[in-house]
Amino acid sequence: MRCRLRLEGRSYAHRLYAERALLTPAAHPDRSAWEKPGFLLWHATLRWQRMVGVALKPIGLTHVQFVLLASAWFLEDRTGPPSQRELAEHAGTDAMMTSQVLRSLETDGLVERHPDPADARIKRLTVTAEGRAAAARALDAVDALDKVFFGPAGDRDDLVGLLRTLAGRDADGVPLD
């Protein structure tokens, strides 16, 4: 379906010019989308996410469940039970979506949510023994996939450094900006 222009009362030349502007690529008409880094990164990310989904299916986790479960386990071991907000910030996920996914993980017996002793409005998360086992299996599966997927990129440490730079984070995940 073509976009209709609201050009009533305009001259024929103006209407023709406006229509051609819609049909003419504005920038880099000689470059393929497959030469643009952002477009390639988008497609590489989509491919990687599909492959992660396949790797996690036998474990019974979705990709976002895996990220939140593994992140909760990491944060809990490092600094104690995280709050839902801390988990969302660490994982880079929306707070509302994080809460919904945590509800699912809680129903499955993989995490528990408890009120913070100092502030009952804050929910603290603990990963259950079953959750730790599922996270460990999932981490093994994703690590194996990453070796295959990212192998063609060359040196792992160089790739991780580049990805950290692109993500705007240091080695501890602290924003560089």
Q: How would you name each of these model-derived features?
A:
Residues 46-94:
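N-terminal helix-turn-helix DNA-binding core of bacterial DNA-binding proteins
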Residues 3, 103-161:
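Charged, amphipathic alpha-helical coiled-coil/dimerization segments
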Residues 37-56, 135-170:
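Hydrophobic alpha-helical core bundles mediating ligand binding, dimerization, or RNAP-core interactions
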Residues 1-59, 157-158, 177:
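N-terminal leader segment of winged-helix/HTH proteins
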Residues 84, 102-103:
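Short, hydrophobic-biased segments on the C-terminal half of alpha helices
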Residues 78, 168-177:
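Short, charged, intrinsically disordered terminal tails
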